[in-house]
UniProtKB/Swiss-Prot annotation:
Lineage: Archaea, Methanobacteriati, Thermoplasmatota, Thermoplasmata, Thermoplasmatales
Organism name: Thermoplasma acidophilum (strain ATCC 25905 / DSM 1728 / JCM 9062 / NBRC 15155 / AMRC-C165)
Domain of life: Archaea
Residues found modified as Diphthamide: 598
PANTHER family reported for this sequence: ELONGATION FACTOR-LIKE GTPASE 1, TRANSLATION ELONGATION FACTOR-RELATED
Family: Belongs to the TRAFAC class translation factor GTPase superfamily. Classic translation factor GTPase family. EF-G/EF-2 subfamily.
Domain tr-type G: start-end pairs: 19-228
Gene: fusA
Identification of the protein by name: Elongation factor 2
A matching Pfam family: GTP_EFTU
Length: 732
């Protein structure tokens, strides 16, 4: 253990010097070599033995991660590296590449200022590479590039040095295209990666070597020499001359920003408070003397210590015993403070601005929470998750006595991983857990059984559907039970560009808008009429409610209740009680009783609800199902088997490319058709297949299947078989 503590000892001398700190992440498509690279960097910095690097997978410390050979949690390691005679502290966060764990990537990006993008030289830039680059750039995180598995180009594809360089050029061009597309405007040119200035490195993480143009100038090794070393089995020798960790960490220190530099442009992206306030200035300057401002990016549930909140400290100094306020959860006292190295927490007395801290004592904090020494700090912007849960399981305790424990465990799990949603089905009393895919739920169930020791039984996986409308419906009259109040709503589909702006986080959720003027301008730019935009009342999920009435008496007093009715309908659609997607509801008229006693919640909420439901019935209700884009690489002779497997699952082939004997297929497949796909595609192609996928939003269920799917959902939820029609809502 000694070397780790020594390292933390060195680190503690550096923590107050922000110019010597780098907070970095490593991102990549699944299996492109992220964790292997992380372990090499940790070994090189003396945190574990060099022989084990790449084989030990320090950051894959979860039993499941080692068994599955993929990274599931975003782990943290702090290490020290000497560059040009100075010691630097590097806080490294390893993130998962598997699409099911995208939530962890989003959270890790908030904690870091720079990122190493790893690309497999054989596969090139893949869909998940694009997703993680987009996530990093959205958080104003600066990239550098490491092209990995060069030995495969030489040994498997038999490329010479010229052919290799052609391939590198293509990868670099692809990455720069994505940077141009997604980088903040002021950085689209400045953040382009180039070989010449050393922002790109090449190598083999597994074999511990790397090379970059600045390193070539020092060692006089050329690409031709590299081909010879690899061909002749001399990669160990190559690794001694060009140590991976030195080349990569030198690149990080040279080209990725320190916390103070990064916070000068990142704070206004991630925090919408007053930048001229005391805390605003302290964060922009990364000032350790200012008030404490920290964002929790991960909660680890430790069997001994309980909840550990890990997060990025943007200003101030945290010490043992400090009282801190947690957004939405009251006050907590710092009991212990530590720096993290994979699974180990090394205790420290204090941590200053610009660092990553692990704190015990912030009870009630969740990933995404704002922690501050000020009671009323404006919270950080919520983190945008690129994918919503698409698969649900019903879960129950095997032994009734374990039920209270199961409820506690589910609460812990949803704290530690906010991309897992836990709901209780009010009708049946069963617990539902929803995640990003089959693997995500498998891993969660494994944790419940093995880490928390609760025996559970689960249903088959259930797909998460959405409801929408196809055309305009209403105005539809909704009457209150006492018949003294009437509301008239219209509904229609929301424009795709408005839905996109909501999903990107440009349009905030809820009904309290900080800068209504700017929001109106944004809506007008997306094609919404100005008068209508001014009447925006509420955003719920990807749906919006507008009030376009004029001068109706007492309406202001009932608006909160109408918002409640709207939110309820958007979370329980009229077809199958599934969430509603992409619908605009407009209140166009209302008739209200003058006596407030006759327009309380029990009158207004049902009237508003029936008006929106009725208008949706008139607007042709449609069921949407989640779809995934699937990417498959197979030898030519297995192409037929792969296409057949896709088509059996209602999939559509969108694209097909050939490179040598390899065929690359891109297909769109409903999530409902993807269960068991992994073993089926391996079986069909005799194991000769590489495949991956990403969530690709929702599409309409084929009309011939809609009725039967709606019926089966309603049956599962204990509802009457047929959905109610417009006449029913009119008669209420």
């Amino acid at each position: 253990m000694g070397r780790k503590e020594d390292n933390i000892e060195k680190a503690l001398k550096i923590v107050e010097h922000t110019e010597l700190i780098r907070n970095i992440g490593i991102v990549a498509h699944i299996d492109h070599g992220k964790t292997t690279l992380s372990d090499n960097l940790i070994a090189g910095a003396g945190m574990m033995s060099e022989e084990l690097a790449g084989k030990q997978l320090v950051l894959d410390y979860d039993e499941q991660e080692q068994a599955r050979g993929i990274t599931i949690n975003a782990a943290v390691a702090s290490m020290v590296h000497t560059f040009q005679g100075k010691e630097y502290l590097i806080n490294l966060i390893d993130t998962p590449g598997h699409v099911d764990f995208g939530g962890d990537v989003t959270r890790a990006m908030r904690a870091v200022d720079g990122v190493i993008v790893v690309v497999d030289s054989v596969e090139g830039v893949m869909p998940q590479t694009e997703t993680v680059i987009r996530q990093a750039l959205r958080e104003h995180v600066k990239p550098v590039l490491f092209i990995n598995k060069i030995d495969r180009l030489i040994n498997e594809l038999r490329l010479n040095s010229d052919e290799m360089q052609k391939r590198f050029t293509k990868i670099i061009t692809d990455v720069n295209r994505l940077i141009s597309k997604y980088a903040p405007q002021q950085f689209t040119k400045e953040w382009q990666v180039s070989v010449q200035d050393g922002r790109v490195a090449f190598g083999s993480a597994y074999n511990n070597w790397a090379i970059s143009i600045p390193a070539m100038a020092e060692t006089k090794i050329t690409f031709k020499d590299i081909v010879e070393y690899v061909k002749n089995g001399k990669q160990k020798e190559l690794a001694q001359k060009n140590q991976l960790h030195k080349i990569i960490l030198n690149m990080v220190i040279r080209h990725l920003p320190d916390p103070k530099t990064a916070q000068s442009y990142r704070i206004k992206q991630i925090w919408k408070g007053d930048l001229d306030s005391e805390i605003g200035k302290a964060m922009i300057n990364c000032d350790y003397k200012g008030p404490v401002a920290m964002m929790v990016t991960k909660i680890i549930i430790d069997p001994h210590a309980g909840e550990i909140a890990i997060g990025r400290l943007f200003s101030g100094t945290v010490k043992k015993g400090t009282d801190l306020y947690i957004s939405g959860a009251g006050k907590g006292k710092v009991q212990t403070l530590a720096m993290m190295v994979g699974p180990d927490r090394i205790p420290v007395d204090e941590i200053t601005a610009g660092n990553i801290a692990a704190i015990v004592g912030l009870k009630g904090a969740i990933a995404g929470a704002t922690v501050s020494s000020l009671e009323n700090m404006v919270p950080f912007e919520p983190m945008i998750h690129y994918s919503e849960p698409v698969v649900t399981l019903a879960i129950e305790a095997k032994h009734t006595a374990d039920l209270p424990r199961l409820i506690e465990v589910l609460r812990d799990i949803s704290k530690a991983d906010p991309s897992i949603q836990v709901d209780i089905n009010q009708e049946t009393g069963e617990h539902l857990i929803s995640g990003m895919g089959e693997l995500h739920l498998d891993v969660t169930l494994y944790r419940i059984k093995n880490d928390y020791k609760v025996e559970v039984e689960t249903s088959d996986p259930i797909v998460v559907y959405r409801e929408t409308v196809e055309k305009k419906g209403g105005p539809f009259e909704g009457k209150s039970p006492n018949k003294h109040n009437r509301f008239y709503f219209e509904v229609e589909p929301l424009k795709p560009e408005v839905i996109q702006a909501i999903e990107d986080g440009d349009i905030p959720q809820g009904s309290k808008f900080k800068d209504k003027k700017a929001l109106v301008e944004l809506l007008v730019s997306k094609g919404i009429d100005r008068d209508e935009a001014k009447g925006l009342v509420c955003v719920e999920g990807t749906n919006m409610m507008f009030d376009v009435t004029r001068g109706i008496q007492y309406l202001d007093e009932t608006m909160e209740l109408l918002i409640e009715a709207f939110v309820e309908v958007m979370n329980r659609g009229p077809l199958a009680n599934e969430k509603v997607f992409g619908v605009k509801a407009r209140l166009v008229d209302a008739k209200l009783h003058e006596d407030s006693i006759h327009r309380g919640p029990a009158q207004v909420i049902p009237a508003g609800r029936n008006s929106i439901y009725g208008a949706m019935c008139e607007a042709k209700r449609v069921l949407l199902e989640p779809v995934q884009r699937v990417f498959i690489n197979v030898p030519q002779e297995e192409m037929g088997a792969a296409i057949n497997e896709i088509q059996q699952r209602r999939g559509i082939i969108e694209d097909m490319k050939q490179e040598g004997d390899e065929i690359s297929l891109t297909a769109k497949v409903p999530v409902a058709g993807m269960f068991g796909f992994a073993s089926a595609i391996r079986g069909a192609t005799g194991g000769k297949v590489l495949w991956s996928f990403e969530n690709a939003g929702y599409q309409k269920v084929p009309p011939e299947l809609q009725d039967s799917i709606v019926r089966s959902i309603r049956e599962r939820k204990g509802l009457r078989q047929e959905p109610y029609d417009a006449d029913y809502y009119a008669s209420m």
